[in-house]
Amino acid sequence: MLFITNRFPTQSIRSRKGRRFTFDLNNNAPSNSVFYCETGSDGHHTEITSGELLKRVRESECRQILLYLHGFNNLPDVVFERAAMLQKFCDEAKPKEVLVLPLVWPCDNDKGVVKDYWDDQKSADQSGYSFARVLERFMEWRNSSDNEPDVAPCLKRINLISHSMGNRVLRQTLAAWDQYDLASGVPLLLRNTFMVAADVVNETLHEGQLGELISHASRNVVVYYASDDLALRASKAANLRNKVASRRLGHTGPENIKRTPRNVFQVDCDDINTSYDRPTGHMYFLSNGNGKTQGQVFEHMFECIVNGRVFPDDPDQRSIILK
């Protein structure tokens, strides 16, 4: 499996194609450098550099790419395990349609969820600068001779799923990209952006807020939320420390969907999330709880990926309840 990361390796940060890459799990500081790698056995991966990774993505038989931004307190092995399940479900639903590409940002390895939460929140914000460089590198590659833009350009569609605090990484990435690299707003880069159990304030996608850039960069933005998500309930309580009392987007959906751009949609998962992930009801976008069968949230996402529309039969519909 290919992946991109801004976690420090135990080796030097100097990139070199073909070298061994081993995560330094005791260092959760985001690196300014970004590493383009391929997974290996026993935690020993291989750095292949950006040109080789983009070449492999371009030459893949899959028609679409699905970037995966994981949540807080997820170490690389867990991220790869979930990404592999995501790839398996995509292949079962429609072979050669989707290639899953995880983006691994640094989560803490300390004991104690509260301490981890604050360390990871800082890492999420700082990771935005690193992954903004990834987007800029992709734009450079897309227009370079390596992509043969005038002969056989890469036409794969790009989708993104961000879970929990991964949505904070997404928001900060687009903000940093817009501030430092772009002249007049972000380009329409993503076909679908799926924000699952998003650990950001529920006004994030409102017009005028920082997260509005997510809707500018996406054809569709789909928010999956559940009011009984225990992990986000704890998150809201933890954020009171910083005097942030607003509810989380993954708890309620947008505070007022009429104040969000028209390409933002919301999906109420309250009836299924705890049966898929007991007892917290937070990790509900993969299986139906048995680890083997696709759940309704995954099926809904995959239908959006294939069709490119959230509600193809009713262009005015913006909400649905999964049961």
Regions found by a protein language model. Give the residues of each.
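Residue in the alpha/beta-hydrolase core beta-strand immediately N-terminal to the catalytic nucleophile
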Residues: 159, 163-164, 194
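Gly/Ala-rich beta-loop-alpha elbow adjacent to hydrolase catalytic centers
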Residues: 131, 162, 166, 170
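Active-site micro-motifs of SAM-dependent methyltransferase domains
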Residues: 74, 167, 200
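Lipolytic serine-hydrolase domain surface
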Residues: 1-46, 59, 80, 95-156, ...
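Short, surface-exposed "cap/lid" segments of acyl-processing enzymes
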Residues: 52-106
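Short, charged/polar micro-motifs that form catalytic or ligand-binding hotspots
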Residues: 69-76, 117-121, 160
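Histidine-centered divalent metal-coordination motifs
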Residues: 70, 163, 282
